[in-house]
C-alpha cells in the first residue's frame, strides 16, 4: 500500500536544517561578518561598498532556498568553500585585498571552479538519478566539467556587462611591457612589435589633461579575463582528477564533497485518530462477515449430513 506524502513547508525544512550545529554556526558567523562589513562600509567607505556587503549576505539564504527547491544537502567541505569564496570576494572588492595580495583573485577563481564542479555534479545526479552510481559516474563527471567551465564563461560576460553598463571596474587591469599590434601598422599582414615599454602617456579631456603611467602599457582587462578562465578551468580539472581517484580509492571523500540528494521536501502523512478508527472498524466488519460466513457454511454442512443419514 502506497504511503501518502505531504510537501514540507520551507519553515519546517529551515528549522530542521539549522539543527545541524556546525553548519548553523558557519552560516551565523558569515552573516555576522557581512553585517559588520556593511556597517563599517556605510560609515567609512561609502554606499557602494555597503550595498556590496548586503548583496553578499544573500549567499547563505540562497543556499537554503536551492537546497529546499532542488532537494539536496550541502556538506561541510562545500560550505567552507562557499563561505571562503564569498568572504574573499567581499574583502577583495571593498578592502583592497586584490592589490595587497595580487594572487588572491586567482585563488578565488580556482575555488569557484571547484564549487561549480560540485554544483554540476549535483545537477547531474538530479538528471541521471542516484541509481547505478558506478555506471553513470563518468557521465556525471563530464557534465560537471562542462557546467563549471560554462558558468566561468558566463561570469566573465557578467563582469564585462557590469563594467560597461554600471561603471564598476570589475575587469582587473594588467601592466605589460611588450605588445604586438596589427592596428599600429594599419595592416593585417604586418604586426608592429613594441618591446621593453617603460611608460605610457595618455592625453585626455580633449588634449587638456595628461596622465603618465610608469612601468609599461596598461592592458584593460584582457589578461585578467583569460587568466580567470584558465585558473577556473584548472580548478575544475584538478577537482575532477581528485574525484576520479576518490571514486576508486576513497569514495567517502566524494560523498563528503558532492552535495547529497535527500528527500527533504516531502514526508509521510501520519494517520489521524478518525482514520485509524475507521480502519479498525472496517477490519472488524470484515472479520465479522468472515466468521458469519464460516458459521453458515458449517450449518449447511451439518444439515446435509443429517439428511443423508435419515435417508439411509
Model-derived regions, located:
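Short, highly charged, low-complexity non-transmembrane loops/tails of multi-pass membrane proteins
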Residues: 253-277
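Aromatic-anchored segments of alpha-helical transmembrane domains
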Residues: 32-38, 83-95, 149-153
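Membrane-interface helix caps and helix-loop-helix hairpins in membrane proteins
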Residues: 42-47, 94-104
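Short, hydrophobic transmembrane alpha-helix segments
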Residues: 38-51, 63-72
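Membrane-interface helix-boundary motifs at transmembrane edges
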Residues: 16, 66-77, 130-136
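Short, Lys/Arg-rich, polar N-terminal cytosolic tail immediately upstream
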Residues: 1-17
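Cytoplasmic-side transmembrane-helix entry/capping segments in multi-pass membrane proteins
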Residues: 73-84, 106-108
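Alpha-helical transmembrane segments that form the membrane-embedded catalytic/substrate-binding core
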Residues: 109-117, 143, 147-193, 200, ...
